[in-house]
Structure formats: C-alpha cells, structure tokens
A protein has these predicted regions:
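PIN-domain endoribonuclease scaffold, especially VapC-family toxins
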Residues: 28-83
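Residues at secondary-structure transition points
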Residues: 20, 37, 59-62, 87-94
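Short, well-structured N-terminal submotif of metal-dependent ribonuclease cores
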Residues: 1-38
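Short, active-site-adjacent cap segments at secondary-structure transitions
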Residues: 11-12, 44-45, 115-117
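Short, flexible helix/strand-to-coil boundary loops that buttress conserved ligand/catalytic motifs
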Residues: 15-16, 50, 120, 137
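Acidic, PIN/NYN-like endoribonuclease modules and their adjacent C-terminal/linker elements
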Residues: 94-97, 101-139
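Mid-chain, well-packed structural core segment of small domains
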Residues: 73-108
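Short secondary-structure boundary segments
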Residues: 8, 40-41, 111-113
C-alpha cells in the first residue's frame, strides 16, 4: 500500500474546503486507500496549527483532538531522533524529510514545493495535492 507524508498545509486545506484535492486525499485516507506516515513531531505540528485556526475552521479544541485521533488511527507512526544538519530551504520543513527517510516513505505532499524541492536529491518525491490525488486515484 502506498505510504506518504502530508505537510500541515495539506491537512489545513482539507478542513478549509471540501472541494479541493486536499479534502479528497483525506477522504481516501479514511477509506484506507493509502497510509499516512506520521511522527510525534508532525502530529504536534498538526495540532498546533489546527488549534490556532480552530475558530476559522468552525472547530473546538475537542473537535481538533478527535480529528487528529482519527487521522492517527489511519497512520503509521515513526519516531524521529536527534536532528541533523538542515538540508532544506526552511529548517521547519526538515522533520518532513527526516520522517520520509526514517520511514521509507518516498513521497511528501505539500502546497509549498519550493521549500521541499531539495528533498528530491534524497530520493523523495514532493508533489502538490492534485498530483498526489492523481496517483492514489489510479486503478
């Protein structure tokens, strides 16, 4: 089964609109059509961003906790250890690359290709949600 990492901006976009590729990607995750790869660090980032945006999303903190619990159940959790020297343009995105390397997931989906493009040098594909959706929709 395909395993991939979702940048926080994809999770947020999936909750802001039920019409885009990000929303469809999360629907397919819920149906078990692919596996999300998570680390504790990434899950905490999801939580921080979603709780900060909870009023805009029409969610309470309890709603966010329930949502993240459901996502966690559809994910493979991988523990990350000591940080390495940053290799990406935005050091805040470094845990995504480290997670991909540690988990064997070869795909990161994000709305911010520019910061993650150097991941390709490490054998990690970085795709926009619409491109990832095409992959997981193929028969």
């Amino acid at each position: 089964m395909l395993r991939a990492i979702l940048d926080t901006n994809v999770i947020l976009a999936s909750l802001l609109s039920n019409r885009g590729a990000s929303f469809e990607i999360l629907q397919k995750l819920r149906r078990g059509e692919w596996r999300l790869v998570l680390s504790n660090h990434l899950l905490l980032e999801y939580e921080e961003v979603l709780k900060r945006n909870a009023p805009t999303l029409g969610m309470t903190f309890d709603d966010v906790d329930r949502y993240l619990n459901a996502i966690s159940k559809a994910a493979d959790c991988v523990e990350l250890f000591a940080p390495q020297t940053p290799r990406l343009l935005d050091p805040d995105d470094e845990p995504l690359l480290r997670l991909a390397e540690a988990s064997g997931a070869r795909l990161i989906t994000t709305h911010n290709l520019r910061h993650l493009r150097p991941a390709a040098a490490h054998g990690i594909a970085v795709l926009l949600p619409r491109d990832f959706l095409r992959i997981i929709t193929q028969p």
